[in-house]
Amino acid sequence: MAISLLDTAFEAELRALVFLFFLDEPVNADYLGAIDTLTINQRSFGIGSDNLNGTHRLAAGELRTRTDLMRQALKQLALKGLTIFDTSAEQVGFRITDEGASVVNKLRTEYAERFFAAALDTFEAAGRASTRQLAKIITSVEAAS
């Protein structure tokens, strides 16, 4: 996936905030990269009826780039005080702060609404799947393409 204007670290920051808003446990960039890949490309992965950024054959190939974008995004979000790195739970990772949740609550565009719905659908479909299980889903679709 070539990084385009729509796939900047800033856009990844907004998507990461939305994901963290819905999660009640700390997560890392690998998990968010997998969830991001599935959410943006729902139709390609059989989760929903739409691919938010359009349909293409190489959706499964986005995992590494989306994970890298999430890694950059989480660093910036932590520096801005919108996330914290939580080591108090059994699973360490990033959580959203109250300030980060406030930013999410201000996202009111049509795309944001579509993204919220897609993220919820993805979390419902993923259930309690681990990062490894999500990556396996993504790569199995790539192999089948």
What are these regions (language model features)?
Residues 70-81:
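Basic amphipathic alpha-helical segments that dock to polyanions
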Residues 85-109:
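Accessory beta->alpha helical hairpin/"wing" motif in late/C-terminal subdomains of nucleic-acid enzymes
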Residues 1-6:
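Intrinsically disordered, low-complexity serine/threonine- and proline-rich regulatory segments
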Residues 11-26:
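Positively charged, polyanion-binding regions of nucleic-acid-associated proteins
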Residues 28-40:
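Short, hydrophobic, well-ordered secondary-structure elements
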Residues 23-30, 44:
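Short capping segments at the starts of secondary-structure elements
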Residues 38-43, 52-67:
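Short helix-coil junctions and helix-kink-helix linkers
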Residues 109-145:
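Exposed, interaction-prone assembly regions rather than primary DNA-binding/catalytic cores
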